[in-house]
């Protein structure tokens, strides 16, 4: 799993990004298992010379049957506790989704058929958050629009959400 030659790389990984299943924060037993698993794999990542990072998942939205307005709070607490126990960084993707839905409730980031998987906009937002979590800075000059499928105004909105989320998350966790 952590052998770079398996994917054609000649050097070690610098960062390994890990994500749990979306249901793991939903019960205390699953949260405990998640945290123990994160600690275990973070140790393996470090043993291979890399740093661990967690990709914080986003909350379910309708039509998912387990939609809960407070789900993102549970997710954030779960990921932050696991990151602290594992001494890992967090890419707060779930918080970026929540911020976007607060600012523009009708702007969808999820596939409409299940309310759990991200659509193009959600995937773009997640990528922006991960980029900023890894490299810092800002997204000025990022012109990628998925071959014209993401209008420039939408791309800039999602970049702004990512930048604001990272700034607030870093201020709250440092």
Roles of regions detected by a PLM:
Residues 5-120, 132:
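Alpha-helical cap/lid subdomain in secreted, periplasmic
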């Amino acid at each position: 799993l952590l052998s770079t030659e398996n994917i054609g790389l000649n050097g070690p990984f610098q960062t390994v990004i890990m994500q749990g299943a979306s249901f793991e924060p939903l019960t205390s037993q699953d949260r405990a298992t998640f945290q123990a698993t994160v600690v275990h794999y973070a140790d393996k990542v470090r043993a291979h010379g890399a740093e661990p990072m967690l990709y914080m998942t986003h909350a379910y939205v309708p039509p998912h049957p387990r939609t809960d307005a407070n789900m993102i709070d549970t997710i954030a607490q779960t990921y932050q506790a696991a990151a602290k126990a594992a001494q890992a960084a967090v890419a707060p993707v779930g918080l970026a989704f929540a911020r976007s839905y607060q600012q523009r409730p009708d702007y969808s980031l999820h596939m409409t058929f299940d309310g759990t998987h991200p659509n193009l906009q959600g995937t773009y937002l997640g990528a922006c958050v991960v980029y900023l979590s890894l490299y810092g800075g800002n997204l000025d000059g990022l012109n990628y629009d998925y071959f014209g499928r993401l209008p420039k105004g939408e791309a800039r909105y999602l970049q702004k959400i990512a930048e604001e989320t990272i700034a607030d998350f870093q201020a709250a966790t440092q």
